[in-house]
Amino acid sequence: MEKFAPEFHGEDANNKATKFLESIKGKFASSKDPKKKDSIISVNSIDIEVTKESPITSGTNIINPISEADSTPEAKANYPRKPLDSFKEDLTPSDNPFSKLYKETIETFDNNEEESSYSYEEINDQTNDNITARLDRIDEKLSEILGMLHTLVVASAGPTSARDGIRDAMVGLREEMIEKIRAEALMTNDRLEAMARLRNEESEKMAKDTSDEVSLNPTSKKLSNLLEDNDSDNDLSLDDF
């Protein structure tokens, strides 16, 4: 059985506390003896004055006392200092990825096959290769639709709930692909019509500009005669202008 210290309450506890304080009062109230020499302990460059009668002298450990010899420059270790990293980088206009001109230049000259259907290059390109590329993409999308239909046929052999879910998903994808193909076809047709219209306009301009002759007005004719004949009688007057 463990023994516990007795508990005191009320007046009895007050009397016990008073007697205890009186018993230890003499230990801490003793005057300092001038004959006893005090010791000074230097702990981490902090001077602590400790008397010989002080209770903290027992079991006191001096941690890393600093001596005068260690404070010399030769005793200190020479550690190389790492330069600070700078997070500010001055980019040239050609290396700045946030530059609009740089981005447009890269997109123009980069042969990126994954371009959108309405890219800048395709809108301004009126060559036959561009139309052929669009038709190839339409054919690829039609092949994807055929593949989805084949998957739908294979999935129809499964359970009813799974078959219905797959069928609804495939039908939705098929409708979406059909709309995209229709938009591609309409855009391709519009481009073909625009190319034909521009070709006809250029043909009409070339038909009107078949003559290589240059006609001169009367004043230009007089100037031409003056230069050819070099005659003073053909001098121009203000009335000629």
Curated annotation (Swiss-Prot):
Q: Where is this region: Disordered?
A: 55-75, 201-241
**What compartments host this protein?**
Virion; Host cytoplasm
Residue ranges for the region (Binding to RNA-directed RNA polymerase L) are 216-232
Record field: compositional bias (Basic and acidic residues): 201-211
Chain spans, region Binding to monomeric RNA-free nucleoprotein: 1-30
The record's listing under InterPro entries reads:
EF_Hand_1_Ca_BS (IPR018247), Pprotein_pneumovir (IPR003487)
Record PTM Phosphothreonine, positions in chain: T108
Which residue ranges have biased composition labelled Acidic residues?
228-241
What Gene Ontology cellular-component terms does the record carry? host cell cytoplasm; virion component
Q: Name one GO biological process term.
A: symbiont-mediated suppression of host NF-kappaB cascade
Please give the chief subcellular localization of this protein. virion
One example GO MF annotation = RNA-directed RNA polymerase activity
Q: Where is this region: Binding to the N-RNA complex?
A: 232-241
Pfam families from the UniProt entry: Pneumo_phosprot (PF02478)
Site positions per UniProt: Interaction with protein M2-1: T108
The UniProt function text for this chain reads: Plays critical roles in regulating RNA replication and transcription through its interactions with multiple proteins. Tethers the RNA-directed RNA polymerase L to the nucleoprotein-RNA complex. Recruits the M2-1 protein, a processivity factor that is required for efficient transcription of viral RNA. Acts as a chaperone for neo-synthesized nucleoprotein by forming an N-P complex that preserves N in a monomeric and RNA-free state and prevents the association of nascent N with host cell RNAs. Recruits the host phosphatase PP1 to inclusion bodies to regulate viral transcription.
* Protein family membership: Belongs to the pneumoviridae phosphoprotein P family.
Quaternary arrangement and interactors, per the entry? Homotetramer. Interacts with protein M2-1; the interaction between the two tetramers is required for the anti-termination and elongation transcriptional activities of protein M2-1. Interacts with host phosphatase PP1; this interaction recruits PP1 to the inclusion bodies. Formation of a complex PP1/M2-1/P allows P to target host PP1 phosphatase to the M2-1 substrate. Interacts (via C-terminus) with the nucleoprotein N (via N-terminus); the phosphorylated phosphoprotein P binds to N-RNA complex. Interacts (via N-terminus) with the monomeric RNA-free nucleoprotein N.
What's in the domain note? The N-terminus is important for viral particle assembly. The oligomerization region is central. The C-terminus part contains binding regions for the RNA-directed RNA polymerase L and the nucleoprotein.
Protein name, UniProt field: Phosphoprotein
Give the gene name.
P
